């Protein structure tokens, strides 16, 4: 990609070569200073899929992992510190300078769990959307859809506390086919 001036106070990018549109494109206009960076993961395949900042500057990263309980970093007080098998989801919170892992949890069941979207509201709650093949996926009592409906995957939507210690809401979302919600957007009422 190349940077281009499209008009007064209007900028854009033009594609100058082949690219994979499934990959995230990150562009740093300065390209001279790396402010902060860190690693997160264990010995298995770890895929960070979502990144978000809260109002205090904490950095949330979420994705899915094949790394076991023995080596993926979780924190005391986390909602779930146990790897359940297949790909499990993870959600982690770093300090704004990425020097401290403040909270980190697994989230998922014994099957394969994929995370596709994460959002934060102004109160600091963490919302997740993705797909699961886990019949034992963590669903709260009284959920909209408490039972896995079948197919290769059912979608799910979940809400965690900002400190990643408490599952506040979760539900399956799907029918008898394969259901994979691709994104999650909160409205002005955080619904």
Question: PLM ranges: what are they?
Answer:
Residues 36-37, 51, 61-63, 77, ...:
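Hydrophobic strand positions within the blades of repeat-based beta-sheet folds
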Residues 53-57, 120-124, 186-190:
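Residue-level detector of Asp-centered blade-edge/turn motifs that repeat once per structural unit
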Residues 31-46, 100-112, 166-177:
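Short loop/turn motifs that cap or connect beta-strands within the blades
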Residues 63-90, 130-156:
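Acidic/polar, solvent-exposed loop segments in beta-strand-rich repeat domains
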Residues 8-12, 58, 88, 125, ...:
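A generic structural signal for beta-strand entry/edge sites
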Residues 45-47, 87, 112-114, 153, ...:
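Beta-rich catalytic cores
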Residues 1-52, 58:
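Charged substrate-recognition surface patches at the periphery of nucleic-acid/ligand-binding domains
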């Amino acid at each position: 990609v190349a940077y281009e001036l499209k008009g007064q106070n209007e900028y854009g990018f033009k594609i100058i070569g082949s690219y994979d549109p499934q990959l995230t494109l990150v562009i740093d206009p300065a390209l001279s200073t790396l402010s902060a960076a860190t690693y997160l993961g264990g010995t298995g395949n770890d895929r960070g899929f979502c990144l978000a900042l809260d109002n205090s500057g904490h950095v949330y990263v979420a994705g899915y992992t094949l790394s076991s309980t023995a080596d993926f970093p979780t924190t005391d007080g986390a909602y779930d510190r146990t790897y359940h098998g297949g790909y499990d989801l993870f959600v982690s919170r770093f300090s704004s300078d990425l020097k401290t892992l403040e909270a980190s949890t697994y989230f998922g069941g014994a099957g394969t769990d994929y995370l596709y979207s994460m959002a934060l509201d102004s109160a600091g709650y963490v919302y997740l959307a993705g797909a699961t093949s886990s019949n034992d996926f963590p669903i709260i009592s009284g959920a909209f859809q408490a039972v896995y409906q079948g197919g290769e995957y059912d979608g799910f939507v979940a809400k965690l506390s900002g400190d990643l210690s408490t599952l506040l809401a979760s539900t399956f979302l799907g029918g008898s086919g394969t259901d994979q919600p691709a994104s999650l957007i909160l409205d002005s009422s955080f619904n």
